[in-house]
Amino acid sequence: MANSKSAKKRALQSEKRRQHNASRRSMLRTYVKKVIAAIKSGDHKAATEAFAAAQPIVDRMATKGLIHKNKAARQKARLNTKIKALAA
C-alpha cells in the first residue's frame, strides 16, 4: 500500500494507464481478429478491407509503445501473406 502522497499519486496514475492500455490492446486484438475472420471465410475483398482498417491501428499502437514495432511489422506481414494467398 502506498504511504506517501507521491506514491499514492503514482499508484493512481499507474492504474489509470493500465486501464487505458487494456482498452487499446483490446481494440487492437479486435481489428486483427476481424482480418483473420475475413481470411478464414475466404473472402479476399473483405479481408483486404479489414486489413486496410487494421493496418493504421497496428502502426499507431506500435508508435504509442503498446506493442513493439517489430511485432507490429510481423503481424502485418503475416496477415498480408495470408491475404495474398487467398488471391492466388
From Swiss-Prot:
Q: Which Gene3D superfamilies match?
A: Ribosomal protein S20 (1.20.58.110)
Keywords for this protein: Ribonucleoprotein, Ribosomal protein, RNA-binding, rRNA-binding
GO molecular function, a single term: structural constituent of ribosome
Q: Which GO terms describe its biological process?
A: translation
Q: One GO CC term of this entry? A: cytosol
InterPro entries to which the protein is assigned, alphabetical: Ribosomal_bS20, Ribosomal_bS20_sf
- Region of interest called Disordered, as start-end residue ranges on this chain: 1-27
Q: Where is the signal peptide?
A: none
Q: Name one Pfam family in it.
A: Ribosomal_S20p
Cited SUPFAM superfamilies: Ribosomal protein S20 (SSF46992)
Q: Say yes or no: keyword Transferase present.
A: no
* Record function comment: Binds directly to 16S ribosomal RNA.
Q: Which family does it belong to?
A: Belongs to the bacterial ribosomal protein bS20 family.
Q: Which protein, by its recorded name, is this?
A: Small ribosomal subunit protein bS20
